[in-house]
């Protein structure tokens, strides 16, 4: 298991908002924070799935350096889309963070890892595996649009979206 480290990020969402208010979108505060890292940012990569995390695994198997995986699970609370094994895969492949419009599981273990994950809640139920979903399309939830190649910034205060890199 990969445990949390003392990592610092050179921004806060509050300061980013104050300095860039006219060009940012702010997600509604619906997410819980999981993992040992609480701040992250990167280029948006999107998935649209429903109760099937096959595409999550496929995406996390590639190099995610400088990228944040946005998983639109249609806000389903019936099963988890990310667990400790996928969190470890994300760490191994250098993903900056994951935002899940749905649930995660293994939260106790994930909270000890050097990973940043935002999700709606937890569920012990695993997802189905049918390899159904869409990759790199605009997804909308939490009152904002997550568009591939744009940028997301997240910390304990919230989630911001920008068309350009700010830090």
Language model segments and positions:
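Feature captures the catalytic cores and cofactor-binding loops of soluble hydro-lyases/lyases
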Residues: 2-148, 165-167
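Active-site/ligand-binding-proximal alpha/beta "capping" segment
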Residues: 154-167
């Amino acid at each position: 298991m990969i445990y949390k480290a003392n990592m610092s990020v050179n921004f806060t969402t509050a300061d980013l908002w104050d300095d860039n208010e006219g060009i940012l979108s702010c997600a509604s505060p619906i997410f819980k924070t999981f993992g040992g890292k609480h701040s992250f940012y990167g280029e948006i990569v999107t998935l649209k799935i429903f109760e099937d995390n096959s595409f999550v695994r496929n995406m996390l198997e590639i190099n995610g350096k400088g990228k944040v995986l946005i998983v639109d699970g249609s806000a389903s609370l019936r099963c988890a889309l990310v667990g400790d094994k996928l969190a470890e895969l994300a760490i191994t492949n250098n993903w900056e963070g994951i935002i899940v419009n749905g649930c995660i599981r293994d939260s106790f273990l994930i909270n000890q890892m050097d990973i940043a994950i935002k999700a709606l809640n937890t569920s012990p139920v695993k997802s189905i595996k049918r390899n159904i979903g869409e990759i790199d399309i605009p997804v909308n939830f939490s009152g904002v649009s997550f568009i591939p190649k744009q940028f997301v910034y997240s910390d304990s205060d919230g989630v911001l979206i920008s068309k350009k890199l700010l830090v």
